[in-house]
């Protein structure tokens, strides 16, 4: 089967958003997600959910959007001139979690589907997505667990899938103007449309459903670690890098803003607090320095 079933995809994305929100509420134990539904004049809309000031999660956002239109933004057609003049639909779930405890990493996950159609021609469609981890204080066993889970999700689809999408993730979440990675990576894929729709949809479902099994054990393991002002200040400083990447380099942010998406939802990925410090350097041999030497440089964790 190679004809995309848009209703089937939408149904999965909505149920995935529900499942992720329920599990995050359960582990936080205090706060609930609030929901805002929105419509877009050009076509489509979405539902944005956000949790604020939880016991564990300082802010967590989970967005579903399904937008359509007759003219793609420049961020989408720059590399694909064949899409000019096609009606399009873009749909996906995006998740960004900013914990309060600096020993718990920030995490991001996304699964998405895109289709562009023109009368008399075959539709152009693909899936994309992945997940990545941004620690402030690194733990080798967490990195190994994260990447082992990612590899196990990919393995049924071929032994070459994990290394390929891990490398893509390392390259994508790289802050070029800082010459450093945003975090320790994970998986990133895009333009997935072979061998057929069913294969690509199954893989995307496994990525979406597998994210929490990669992330929540790390949250559980680190949530009781005591922290103070030093750790908090370093966390806020590193969050500044997260902001820089999302506003300067992230294609999803650019696509959303250029296509007239809901700005509040697009910028939900921003941390509630961040800071900058001119010419900061961590103390040699410190836990903060270890992030730069032992965790941010791309490596094979497993």
From Swiss-Prot:
Region of interest (Important for dimerization), residue spans: 242-277
Keyword Ion transport in record: no
KW Metal-binding (keyword) present: yes
Catalysed reactions listed for this entry: coproporphyrinogen III + O2 + 2 H(+) = protoporphyrinogen IX + 2 CO2 + 2 H2O
Cofactor(s) demanded: a divalent metal cation
Disulphide bonds in the chain: none
Known EC number: 1.3.3.3
Binding positions (a divalent metal cation): 98, 108, 147, 177
Cellular location(s): Cytoplasm
GO biological process per UniProt: protoporphyrinogen IX biosynthetic process
Annotated site, Important for dimerization, chain positions: 177
UniProt-annotated catalytic positions: 108 (proton donor)
Pathway assignment: Porphyrin-containing compound metabolism; protoporphyrin-IX biosynthesis; protoporphyrinogen-IX from coproporphyrinogen-III (O2 route): step 1/1
Classification via InterPro entries: Coprogen_oxidase_aer, Coprogen_oxidase_aer_sf, Coprogen_oxidase_CS
Entry binding sites for substrate: 94, 110-112, 260-262
Chief subcellular location: cytoplasm
Keywords, ordered alphabetically: Cytoplasm, Heme biosynthesis, Metal-binding, Oxidoreductase, Porphyrin biosynthesis
Gene Ontology molecular-function annotations: coproporphyrinogen oxidase activity; metal ion binding; protein homodimerization activity
Gene Ontology cellular component annotations, sorted alphabetically: cytoplasm
Subunit structure: Homodimer.
Purpose: Involved in the heme biosynthesis. Catalyzes the aerobic oxidative decarboxylation of propionate groups of rings A and B of coproporphyrinogen-III to yield the vinyl groups in protoporphyrinogen-IX.
Family recorded in the similarity comment: Belongs to the aerobic coproporphyrinogen-III oxidase family.
Protein name: Oxygen-dependent coproporphyrinogen-III oxidase
Organism of derivation: Photorhabdus laumondii subsp. laumondii (strain DSM 15139 / CIP 105565 / TT01)
Gene: hemF
């Amino acid at each position: 089967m190679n004809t995309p079933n848009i209703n089937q995809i939408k149904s999965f994305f909505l149920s995935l958003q529900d499942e992720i929100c329920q599990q995050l509420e359960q582990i936080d134990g205090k706060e609930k997600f609030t929901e805002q539904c929105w419509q877009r004049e050009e076509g489509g809309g979405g539902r944005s959910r956000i949790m604020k000031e939880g016991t564990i999660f300082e802010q967590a956002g989970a967005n579903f959007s399904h937008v359509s239109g007759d003219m793609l933004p420049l961020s989408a057609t720059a590399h694909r001139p064949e899409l000019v003049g096609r009606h399009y639909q873009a749909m996906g779930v995006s998740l960004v979690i900013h914990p309060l405890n600096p020993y718990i990493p920030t995490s991001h996950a996304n699964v998405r589907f895109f289709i562009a159609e023109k009368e008399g021609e075959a539709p152009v469609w693909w899936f994309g997505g992945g997940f990545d981890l941004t620690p402030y204080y690194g733990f080798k066993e967490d990195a190994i667990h994260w990447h082992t889970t990612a590899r196990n999700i990919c393995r049924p689809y071929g032994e070459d899938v994990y290394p390929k999408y891990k490398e893509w993730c390392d390259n994508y979440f790289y802050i070029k103007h800082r010459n450093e990675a945003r975090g320790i990576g994970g998986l990133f894929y895009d333009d997935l449309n072979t061998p057929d729709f069913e294969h690509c949809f199954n893989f995307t479902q496994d990525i979406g459903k597998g994210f929490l099994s990669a992330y929540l054990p790390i949250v559980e393991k680190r949530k009781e670690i005591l922290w103070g002002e030093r750790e908090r200040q370093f966390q806020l400083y590193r969050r500044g890098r997260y902001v820089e990447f999302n506003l300067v380099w992230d294609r999803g942010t650019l696509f959303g803003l250029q296509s007239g998406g809901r700005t509040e939802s697009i910028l939900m990925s921003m941390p509630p607090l961040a800071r900058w410090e001119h010419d900061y350097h961590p103390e040699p041999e410190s836990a903060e320095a270890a992030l730069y030497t032992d965790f941010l440089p791309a490596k094979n964790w497993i």
